[in-house]
């Protein structure tokens, strides 16, 4: 199993997340729900950023809280904030990613940036919300991850946005 959550419980104030979930290799699973439903909390549990109050969270065959640097290299993650300085140009992210990820695929990253019209020589702060979201996904895809965790990859627009008729 790529990911396994068994009898997991996490409580924040009056909110309690309870879940059981298994994600086998080579599967695409979507977590859909309203704001505050626990999607981001689930991803943070999988990344070992927070601990469950109860139950077990295993990722890549290990307890998520015990994942080492080598295992974390096999995970690509997108959150609403990339964590990179918005004053950087995309071009400047390439050596950073190459240092963090030995399997960073620079050629493919550059090709994808061109295909999705992400300019390499423009500061991230000049990007629209949609362009920032695309960049974050391209970065997560750029290092051969076994597991991709995409939390609001649309930049926070959410699945519940209202449809506007012309």
Which stretches of residues belong to each language-model region?
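The feature captures the beta-strand-to-loop junction immediately N-terminal to the Walker
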Residues: 32-34
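Helix-to-loop junction immediately C-terminal to a conserved catalytic motif
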Residues: 47
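Conserved signature/switch motifs of ABC ATPase nucleotide-binding domains
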Residues: 133, 142-145
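ABC-family P-loop ATPase nucleotide-binding domains
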Residues: 79-136
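Conserved ABC transporter NBD signature motif
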Residues: 55-66, 70-71
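ABC nucleotide-binding domain signature
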Residues: 30, 73-80
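Catalytic Walker B motif of ABC-type/P-loop ATPase nucleotide-binding domains
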Residues: 148-152, 157
């Amino acid at each position: 199993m790529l990911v396994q959550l068994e009898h997991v419980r996490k409580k924040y104030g009056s909110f309690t997340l309870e879940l059981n979930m298994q994600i086998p290799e080579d599967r695409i699973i979507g977590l859909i729900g309203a704001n505050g439903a626990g999607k981001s909390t689930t991803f943070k549990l999988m990344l070992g950023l927070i601990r469950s109050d109860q139950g077990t969270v295993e990722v890549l065959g290990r307890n998520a809280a015990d994942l080492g640097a080598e295992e974390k290299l096999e995970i690509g993650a997108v959150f609403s904030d990339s964590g990179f300085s918005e004053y950087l140009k995309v071009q400047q992210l390439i050596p950073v990613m190459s240092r963090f990820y030995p399997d960073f695929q620079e050629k493919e990253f550059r090709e994808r940036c061109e295909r999705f019209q992400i300019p390499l020589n423009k500061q991230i702060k000049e990007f629209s919300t949609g362009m920032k979201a695309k960049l974050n996904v391209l970065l997560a895809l750029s290092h051969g991850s076994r597991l991709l965790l995409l939390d609001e990859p649309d930049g926070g627009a959410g699945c519940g946005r209202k449809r506007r008729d012309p």
